[in-house]
Amino acid sequence: MINDILKDAENRMKKSLEVLADDLAKIRTGRAHPDLLAHVTIDYYGVETPITQAANITVLDARTLGITPWEKGLSSKIEKAILTSDLGLNPTNLGDSLRVPMPALNEERRKELVKLVKSETEAGRVSIRNIRRDANGDIKELLKEKEITEDQAKKAEDDIQKITDKMIAQADALAAKKEQDLMAV
């Protein structure tokens, strides 16, 4: 019973961390990274489709992405989608492929992105804390129904707190790494 609650809480917290890691990966640093375009979509036969499902995205060098669409007619759609995204990128259409150079980030934009990293991280922390609250509520429910003793409940709540502290530390580590990447010139 208690172990199920602990495992469920830990798994849900890990999923929250994965979501946070995905959200942080979408924030542009000065380096080229294929995940940067993961949330950009194009109209592909009437369906909004991520670029990653309609083209190969490769890193040509530290500051340039190469995009090779699987169909020739998609180059212009992909170019338009990247231009209208909020990433501030200007792709170059080479006909059968695209090159996407990453402009250097200015200091003001870096600070905005660091604020965004902090807010995303705080949202991740709140999610983890909500999971802790739910798990503690489940433990209190078991105690109320006399299925566990007070000592077992206290130990379970301590275990949940340890898991929560560990997950929040991992979230902070992800944020610190992203901030370091952003501030590196």
Swiss-Prot record:
It is found in: Cytoplasm. One of its GO terms (biological process) is cytoplasmic translational termination. Pfam families: RRF (PF01765). Responsible for the release of ribosomes from messenger RNA at the termination of protein biosynthesis. May increase the efficiency of translation by recycling ribosomes from one round of translation to another. Belongs to the RRF family. One of its GO terms (cellular component) is cytosol. It comes from Francisella tularensis subsp. holarctica (strain LVS). HAMAP family: RRF. SUPFAM superfamilies: Ribosome recycling factor, RRF. One of its GO terms (molecular function) is ribosomal large subunit binding. Keywords: Cytoplasm, Protein biosynthesis. NCBIfam families: frr. This is Ribosome-recycling factor.
